[in-house]
């Protein structure tokens, strides 16, 4: 990734509550802590540069806490997904690392239900480069899975690159993003605009590139 490439990151964790996670991040980032409520019980940290860091509920996380150093089941308050604002590697990676260290110090940890999502800016991509990227991911499916140690119970949230998608895209050789989008969503039900659209649960998810 180029140091100037814009990206966003979502990090799932447990061990502490969403409020405590937001407070831990505030020790690094500063800013104003707001409670957004809603079903996702979101806490929002608005920093002095105007960006917003969110700490929200995710139903896929197995909630745990520690008592006397022993992990035990916890309530949904201990489901924490950190959603970053738009970042760049050059300006923000050290700050992200500081936030993670602060969260760990506050008691956050992960288990096998936790994952990480990285969203890359697709502004400089072309339809051809997207197709090339899809083929690279498909050709190295097994290598990526082995390197990342993706466990069977997490596979439903991190599916391999679909062979039918790759075959269709290579046959059609789409020249516009609209055509790529049609191929990407082919066979799925429901609105494409849905936040938790079924197509997002893959090792590579194309929506952020297409937007």
Annotated model-derived regions:
Residues 112-116, 120:
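Short, conserved phosphate-binding/catalytic loop or strand-edge motifs used
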């Amino acid at each position: 990734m180029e140091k100037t490439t814009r990206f966003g990151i979502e990090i799932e964790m447990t061990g502490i509550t969403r409020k405590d996670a937001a407070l831990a991040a505030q020790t690094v980032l500063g800013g104003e802590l707001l409670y957004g409520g809603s079903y996702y019980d979101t806490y929002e940290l608005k920093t002095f540069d105007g960006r917003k860091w969110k700490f929200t509920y995710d139903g896929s996380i197995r909630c745990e806490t520690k008592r006397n150093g022993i992990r035990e089941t916890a309530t949904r308050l201990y489901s924490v997904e950190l959603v970053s604002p738009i970042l760049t590697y050059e300006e923000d990676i050290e700050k992200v690392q500081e936030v993670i260290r602060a969260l760990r110090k506050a008691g956050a940890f992960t288990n096998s239900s936790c994952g990480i999502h990285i969203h890359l800016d697709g502004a400089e991509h072309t339809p051809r480069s997207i197709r090339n990227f899809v083929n690279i991911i498909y050709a190295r499916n097994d290598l990526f899975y082995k390197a990342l140690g993706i466990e069977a119970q997490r596979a439903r949230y991190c599916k391999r690159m679909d062979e039918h998608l790759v075959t269709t895209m290579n046959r059609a050789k789409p020249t516009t993003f609209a055509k790529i989008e049609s191929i990407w969503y082919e066979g799925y039900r429901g609105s494409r605009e849905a936040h938790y659209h079924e197509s997002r649960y893959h090792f590579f998810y194309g929506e952020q590139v297409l937007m």
